[in-house]
């Protein structure tokens, strides 16, 4: 990720030169902390200490930025930050355990909640979220296939775990958060033949 410039420009008095990644990171951060309606060109320019010309160098309008934010968040490039790429290389039981324990990491869910909420009102973002969910489902389903479950059993077990994760995203403020031990207990049930 590109380094965030300081508010008001660089120490030399010259305005920082921002990349597309800088803009999408700043937009995503604002989306997470304040919601979709807070993401405005003037607000981001103030936050980043640059003029609107810098924004228009990368984007045609705010919708173009929002598309880039959605793409960044749900892309396979972000799978490393989400932990998907590293878990695929682990032994299968450890892979499931790692994915399960990701469910109790509050930091990961802030952006997830914001993007999923945004997807409810934007069909393009909803499509990106569906593609992300499908990638996650595939990783989990493949893990159950590796454990020797047939295709139907693997899909049902993977669905149980993936839907539990999505439910946690939406229920985490009103329901008790599962502990690592409870996640482990669920995984023990799911891997039992």
For each feature predicted by the language model, list its residue ranges.
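Hydrophobic/aromatic-rich alpha-helical bundle segments in the mid-to-C-terminal region
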Residues: 126, 130, 145-193
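Solvent-exposed, amphipathic alpha-helical segments
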Residues: 22, 26-34, 80-84, 115, ...
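Short, basic, alpha-helical segments at the C-terminal edge of helix-turn-helix-like DNA-binding modules
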Residues: 41, 71-77
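Amphipathic alpha-helical packing segments from all-alpha helical-bundle domains
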Residues: 78, 106-113, 123-148, 155-159
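Residues in soluble alpha-helical coiled-coils and helical-bundle/repeat scaffolds
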Residues: 60-64, 86, 120, 124, ...
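Helix-turn-helix
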Residues: 19-22, 26-68
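N-terminal intrinsically disordered/low-complexity leader segments
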Residues: 1-18, 149
